[in-house]
Amino acid sequence: MQAIIMAAGRGSRLGNLTDTIPKAFLTAKEHRLIDYNLSLLHENGIDDIKIVTGYKAGLYEDLAKEHAGITCIYNPFYAHCNVLGSFYMAQNELRDEDTVYLHADTLCDPAIFEEMVQGTGDIVMPVDFKTCDKEAMKVITEAGQVVKVSKEIPEMEAEGEFIGMAKLSAKAMPAIKAATRKLMREGCLNSYFEGAIQAVIDEGGYRVPTLSTEKRFWGEVDFEEDYRYVKDNLPDALWQIAERHKND
């Protein structure tokens, strides 16, 4: 199993907190956000890790020198495209095998992560079933399967928020790559990665089960209030895993 971490963006909505570092280098309880994600991957036996970089890429390259199994892939167009563009830059480096997809600035309870990695389905999507705001990556489901994922879903129709990490099966990977290439050829530079997921769902023939977060911790650091939430609520179990793997 391999992993791809999306880490190209600057995080400008965090103000001067990201003037000199990418947001995944912000710390919570002594460890950087990126360290927590790397430790979760190692804890689950995943050591082949690709990080798509952009803003302050040199810091990630230095990080890769300190850890075996990490490869950095630079997206020179990170300031002019969204996440799908970064995935496009990296997809030729990804084998068609089970893959964990995640964002460098998103953390979750270790139990959610483990359940996702062990989950069965072609695209296993952790979802926080709750009332969503306009900016949330919202989902609609049928019989436990995601049928629509988009920020454009009306808030009143949404069942919950996709937390931005997923397990992609070996079967789904070629379809995800093909959908990404198609969207890029169509000039969809501002598309989210979920646009490729939706294309695969629409194609049919793939199981896309949800994994409920069940009110367990997760957090995406986009704004200063998000950062405060993560620092105040980060689970001890996640910190302990980071401690255990800090020298990997």
Please tell me what each predicted stretch does:
Residues 61, 66-137, 141:
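Conserved beta-loop-beta/alpha segment of the NTase-like Rossmann-fold superfamily
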Residues 109-184:
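Conserved core of the sugar-phosphate nucleotidyltransferase
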